[in-house]
């Protein structure tokens, strides 16, 4: 599923015609997007392999930033699936295909730090945060948040 299919408020719908038969998109997307429309979005890698879908968006209430997208991978109908907290900066929006791209090999997710739905990690723990960002090659932003309080 993609963000346009989840758009119940018309955020991403074409707004008007330019007079020459071409549509002109107006509205906030894709620079600003509704959080609810992101949950359920597909995530692929650069080899066009399906990595799963976004199950949750984790907001840092101290900074107002999106910290992580929780990616679901594997399993069937929720059984055997593994969840991953992917740093938001590791995901890139592919507006052409209306999905997110994560630069990891599909088989590397088997060994990626993850969790199951009954045992969520403490995502505010600095050691956990450091390990997750190191795995995905992103820089934690929370050092800035802690020093600017």
Regions found by a protein language model. Give the residues of each.
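Peripheral interaction segments used for macromolecular assembly
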Residues: 1-149
């Amino acid at each position: 599923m993609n963000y346009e299919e989840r758009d119940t408020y018309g955020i991403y719908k074409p707004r008007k015609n330019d007079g020459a038969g071409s549509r002109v998109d107006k509205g906030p997307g894709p620079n600003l997007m509704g959080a609810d429309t992101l949950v359920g979005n597909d995530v692929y890698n650069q080899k066009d392999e399906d990595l799963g879908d976004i199950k949750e968006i984790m907001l840092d209430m101290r900074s107002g930033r999106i910290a992580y997208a929780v990616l679901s991978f594997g399993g069937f109908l929720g059984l055997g699936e593994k969840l991953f907290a992917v740093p938001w900066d590791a995901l890139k929006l592919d507006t052409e295909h209306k999905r997110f791209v994560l630069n990891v090999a599909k088989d590397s997710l088997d060994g990626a730090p993850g969790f199951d739905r009954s045992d969520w990690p403490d995502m505010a723990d600095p050691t956990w945060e450091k390990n997750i960002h190191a795995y995905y090659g992103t820089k934690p932003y929370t050092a800035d948040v802690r020093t600017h309080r």
